Amino acid sequence: PNDQLDEEYSDGDIMIQACSNDPQVTFHAIHNLIRPFRDIIKIRWSQHGFISAKKNETPRNLMAFKDGTVNPRKNSDLKKYIFINNGWAKNGTYCIIRRIQIHIETWDRTALEEQEAIFGRKRSTGAPLTGKKEFDNIDLNAKNSKGEYVIDENAHTRLAREVKTSIKRRAYNYNDGTNAKTGNLDTGLLFICFQKSIQQFINIQNNLGHNDKLNEYITHRGSASFLVLPGIQKGGYIGETLFS
């Protein structure tokens, strides 16, 4: 719901993700990989992204809030929510990519207290409004002295948590300069997530898309989904379980 997708940032048959500490290395890795196949493939779209965070720290998005705090980390959770359990794609996963534009100028004019209410978390620490530290449990039933929910009924954190599932987020910020027509910054989030079923993402996004207060400040411009093949054993090859 509420998607405004641009065809130039959507779909595709094969996804390649290259990561490095140097964007020039990343560029040449992709360039050299696809160069031999120019006669048979065409790049549909691409997006450079970046993360600014120390090792083992939760990175922040361009809205200055931590992004990915509730990622599953235990092997049992990864097995339950992320990796496909059976069939030829066993130990593979599904990848969803969303190119989300952030209306940063509007966001910057929003008071900090309102920003934190929208996310349901403290900007400084990433802690839920019902806790003190980033990884404290979220109490969705907590109310203030006025009888109001501490975490707003339409807060991003609440709506995402209401859906009883989990996904593995791996999001990147992007900055593509300014829009020539509006003069506004073209910045946002290249949201990437992994799950054993695409329906997990659909259920979460449906809940967010209808009521999330954050929707006033973001627009989903691109969307794509891919199957990530299982890893390989010694002597094997990528896609072996599919082609053998």
Task: Cite the ranges covered by each PLM segment.
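Long, histidine/aromatic-enriched segments associated with O2/redox biology
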Residues: 1-244
